[in-house]
């Protein structure tokens, strides 16, 4: 996610990020763990992080069981994830396989709305275990901007200093409808794009998904996280797994801390789509939908 908006959320979750965050994730991938099918808006595995906005279970013929969890971002919501709608796992998880079948928020009625939908791991304890002089910020992100629903953002964070916006992250941005990798970058500041190695840039092409729209169609998204890399994928309409990014980079660029898993929708005023500005506060309720969520063992 755009780290300039994360400061408020760090405070919100400080109490929930226990000493388990200091434990490095297991060195081998674990078997599948809890699966939440969202037969109710409440869950033994997740909780709603703030009193703002709303969760609900709604009928949805496109969901596997005919219903889905609806995350509602209210009209007029202020910027920052802490002012959005967000769920978080009750436990911390490490290396393993994470996946979810979901639809991002749809703002087609307000094309310039600044709204992010995300599914991601998150851990920050302000330590500097890697010794690079920056506070650790471990995060694996899958995100979309509702103003450009054909584009997906994949990011690995290891460090972020909120006081000066110094950071360490690698990211890939893909226009899935066109089958075009827009960028694959290493960054130490916002807006920077340093070329990555061949091992960090695989595959070098991604096939187009005709008509892809993250906000109108359910897709399964997931990633397999290990000590040596993160493999991001999507399951298309025919049931085939499509590799989006098979990151095999330096260990220093791969998150290691046990993390909570989160899904959210929130208003941003400083993250624009490619080619145009979209920062408007939502003028109507917007909804993201989650069919199911799979956590690692």
Q: What positions do the PLM features span?
A:
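GH16 jelly-roll
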Residues: 30-297
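Bacterial N-terminal signal peptides
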Residues: 11-22
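C-terminal region of N-terminal signal peptides and the immediate post-cleavage residues
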Residues: 22-32
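Conserved short hydrophobic patches within well-ordered secondary structure
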Residues: 2, 25-26, 231-233
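Bacterial N-terminal signal peptides that target proteins for export
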Residues: 2-13
């Amino acid at each position: 996610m755009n780290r300039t908006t994360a400061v408020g959320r760090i405070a919100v979750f400080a109490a929930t990020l226990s000493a388990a965050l200091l434990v490095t994730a297991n060195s081998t991938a674990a078997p599948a763990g809890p699966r939440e099918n969202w037969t109710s808006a409440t869950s033994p595995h997740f909780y709603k992080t703030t009193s703002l906005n709303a969760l609900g279970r709604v009928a949805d013929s496109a969901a596997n069981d005919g219903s889905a969890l609806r995350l509602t971002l209210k009209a007029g919501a202020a910027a920052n994830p802490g002012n959005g709608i967000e769920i978080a796992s009750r436990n911390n998880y490490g290396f393993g396989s994470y996946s979810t079948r979901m639809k991002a928020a749809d703002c087609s009625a307000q094309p310039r709305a600044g709204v992010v939908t995300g599914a991601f791991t998150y851990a920050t304890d302000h330590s500097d275990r890697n010794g690079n002089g920056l506070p650790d910020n471990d995060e694996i992100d899958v995100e979309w901007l509702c103003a450009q629903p054909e584009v997906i953002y994949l990011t690995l964070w290891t460090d972020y200093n909120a006081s000066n916006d110094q950071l360490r992250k690698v990211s890939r941005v893909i226009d899935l409808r066109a089958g075009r990798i827009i960028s694959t970058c290493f960054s130490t500041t916002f807006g920077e794009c340093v070329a990555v190695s061949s091992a960090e840039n695989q595959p070098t092409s991604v096939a187009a998904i005709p008509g892809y729209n993250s906000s109108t169609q359910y897709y399964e998204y997931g990633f397999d996280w290990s000590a040596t890399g993160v493999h991001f994928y999507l399951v298309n309409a025919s049931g085939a797994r499509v590799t989006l990014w098979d990151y095999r980079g330096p260990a220093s660029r791969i998150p290691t801390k046990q993390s909570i898993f989160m899904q959210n929708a929130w208003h941003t005023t400083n993250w624009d789509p490619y080619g145009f500005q979209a920062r408007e506060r939502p003028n109507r309720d917007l909804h993201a939908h989650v069919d199911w969520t799979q956590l690692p063992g």
